[in-house]
Amino acid sequence: MENTGKIFGISLGPGDPELITLKALKALNAVDVIFCPGTKSGEGRMKSRALDILRQLEVDETKIRLFQVPMSRDRQEALCAYDRVCGEVLELVRSGKSVGITAEGDACFYSSAHYMYGQLAQAGFPVAMIAGVPAFIAAGASVGLHLVKQQERLLVIPGDVIVEELLETIVGKRTLVIMKVPLGEAVL
C-alpha cells in the first residue's frame, strides 16, 4: 500500500502576520513543503506578499517553493502554472509528504488557489482547508467599523462589476465590498 501525505489549503490572512489563525500557523510549521504564489514585477523580479508573510512568521524557508502566477485577464497562463504546481504536489503526497498551498486572506474566498484545490480533489487528494481572515473584515476592524448590524445586508462583488449593478447596490443602501479591485479600476 502506498504511503500518502496530506494537502492543506493554508489561509494566511490579510497580510498582518499577527492575524493568521493559530491553526494555519501550526500547519505551516508541520507540513513538509509549502507552495507559495508570486508574480513578476515590471522589472522582472519575483514578488510575493504570501512569501513576505511567511518570512515575518519565521517559517523554515527551506521548505518553501515559490511559484509564479502570471497576472492578466487571460487566465490561461495562470491555469498552466497551477497545473504544474498540482503535478508537483501530487508527486510529493504520493511519496508521503505533507504539503501546504498558501493563499492570502481566506483560501475559500476569492482565492485563485481554488483551481488547484479542485484539481487535486478530482485526482483523489482532497485538500483540508484552513480558514483565514479576509482583508475586508480586517480593514473594517482596523478602523472600528461595523460592516453590518442587525438586519443590514452585506454584498460582496468582484472588481469587474457592471456599472448598473454597482449603482443598484448604492441606491439600495446596502453595505458593499468590492474584491479584486484592479479588475474593475476602469469602472470605479
Predicted regions and their residues:
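Residue-level signal for alpha-helical context at structural boundaries
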Residues: 72, 154-157, 184
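Short gly/pro/ser/thr-enriched loop/turn and capping motifs at secondary-structure boundaries
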Residues: 41-44, 134-137, 185
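Structural motif
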Residues: 37, 160, 179-183
